Amino acid sequence: PPLEEATKEGAKGPANVPPDASGIDLSTLETKNLSLLYFDPVQTYLTPYIARAFENALIFHQKTFNWTPWDRTTLLLKDFGDYGNAAARSSPNNAVLLDVAPLSVSMETFTPGERFFTLTNHELAHVATMDVWNKRDARWRRFLRGKPMPIQEHPESILWNYLATPRNAVPRWYLEGSAVFFETWMAGGLGRAQGAYDEMVFRAKVRDGDKFYSPLGLESEGTAVDFQVGVNDYLYGTRFFSWLGLTYGPKKVVEWLGRDEASKPFYAAQFRQVFNRKLDDAWNAWIGFERDFQKAQLAKLSAYPLTEVTHLSPIGLGSISRGFVDAKTNSLVAAFRYPGTIGFVGTMDLASGKLRKLQEIKGMMLYKVTSLAFEPATRKAYYTEDNYAFRDLMEIDVDTGRKRMLLRDARIGDLVVNPADKTIWGIRHQNGFATIVRIPLPYAGFNQVHTFDYGLTPFDLDISPDGTQIAASMGEIDGKQSVRVWTTESLLSGNGPQEIARLDLPPSTPESFTFTPDGKGLVGTAYYTGVSNVFTFDIATRKYEVVSNASTGFFRPMPQPDGSLLVYEYTGAGLTPSRIVPQKRDDLGTVEFLGARLIKTHPELKEWGVGSPAKIDLDPLITERGKYRPTKRMKLAAAYPIIEGYQGSYSPGYYFHFEDPMQFSQFDATISVSPFNNLPKRERLHVGLKYKTLN
């Protein structure tokens, strides 16, 4: 049967929504607590589940914080990027933005559970911890006619914002750490507070003598010069909240985040009131605990012989894409992203570690940098740009550095070249679905080979040397992860993938599995013991072996002709290209997760599990379905005193702001007077009007 085809410009029509969102046509699903906005018909299938997940999470947060939301939450579904993300706010109104695209779980940096369940629990934790209020806050919100946002034109708005929503004025580690803490225990322990990646980060810091940031240093240096940039807020915040929960108990954590009548508005003052110590003192105590905790884990791992590692680079290189060894130049072809440089496609000499930049990457990712494939015969590499938007497919000559765009906005990643016929295969994300695609020569368009059901998300695609088999890691809706091997013929036939082998290593996510040079097996990594080690998998026998014992973690192994493996070892400075000799291991050390110690010490956290959203009877909760008309939903969102200046004189006045919940239509009115100098009467009254729309 013919395969669905798309042109160089990508698919057209309602399924491909332009990222500028001009002329938006949104449908709505309304309940008492939720206004869910979405694009019909391509996102309609998601709305019942997401609405249930929202109501499910809301019940938990209302009970936990004794919180009544100040206003209804507006939730917007969007598909403006190829990887999922989310955002939340409580000022000027409660709102959540959710991308429908699959999330990147590279190196288990995100929870492999059902994404909307996890994201909704996480984002509503943000809304709750920022919107919590007591009688004092309520008085200010009524006086200010809402929860004013800080705006540049009127610096006084910073004060009004703090008085109305004091818990909006908090550092990001506070927001993300608390949200990950709740996300994990609301899911019964499946989350980053029990994540192997987080453990590895701090284990590597201790092993390598890397610095720990203070709360102030984290928000300045830690999110600017460290390769993980803003993700450090998640990492540090989550560890600190977990330590607080372990040391003082979950109830104290909730008390700190809450806003009862006796609480302090400023988060640090509230911390001292709840824990009877300064925040900085507690932070330092956590760092001392973390060092001792990780030293104990390193000792457990070294009880068994550790794999000897030869670093091929003199420094850690932050994030590195999938790499390929170019035998002609004895170099590693990959994409690199580390502090002080824009991510680039380049090469690293395997003898000296010297880097050669070929081209900078527009729209690089954090951990993956880009999706990269290499064809040594033609000296061409293929990679993606605009990785957080609609991805473009690029071609680059690894000898000259010349590049050209092959497909614009194709939304394709996880690239691999089929050695048999030089077609490029990849995985395309659109409308929440993942599709395996094939790009034939001359790479002017692509064929959609197979679209997986919602909840099935393949990644880390690879093709056997003879082109007859395809392998990919696969995430399922229930959080299970595996590596699957299919015949290429079954995919091309249109009858669906025919599975010939599967590797499960629960509860870890097997990733970066690639075919061995003889095509009979796969080699990749997994946190099977809590540490990311290298595994080999025999396709015929379906048996696996672990061939390394890492103290931090190994990633993206590449078999070499001499039997060694090129791997990326995780260090305090990120990934470092290295060489190891694989050796079968029958015994490995395991590590204790901080989250595991927390739940063992405080089993009451088991009661935080919110269960499946399926238990929410949604139909009786729906109050309306229709279209979102921004102008009809505009209302007064804030009104507060201001001070302006006119010809050297003070001009007291008032600012009024009207908007719809998504801020698609906004109207501002500023009225002030200048009564304190000898101005003509016609110049004493000042009125400024401004209307803004998306267009």
Region annotations inferred by a language model:
Residues 2-165, 171, 188, 223-226:
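Juxtacatalytic substrate-recognition/specificity segment
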Residues 2-19, 25-30, 227-232, 255-374, ...:
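Beta/coil-rich, acidic/histidine-enriched accessory regions frequently appended to metallopeptidases
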Residues 307-314, 354-362, 402-407, 445-451, ...:
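A short beta-strand motif characteristic of beta-propeller blades
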Residues 192, 317, 335-346, 362-367, ...:
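A flexible loop/linker signature enriched in serine peptidases of the S9 family
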Residues 328-330, 377-379, 420-422, 466-468, ...:
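Short coil/turn segments that connect the beta-strands within blades of beta-propeller domains
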Residues 299, 336, 526, 576, ...:
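Outer-membrane beta-barrel initiation region
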Residues 61, 166-196, 202-277:
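Active-site-proximal alpha-helical
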Residues 349-353, 397-401, 440-444, 488-492, ...:
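Short loop/turn segments that connect beta-strands within beta-propeller blades
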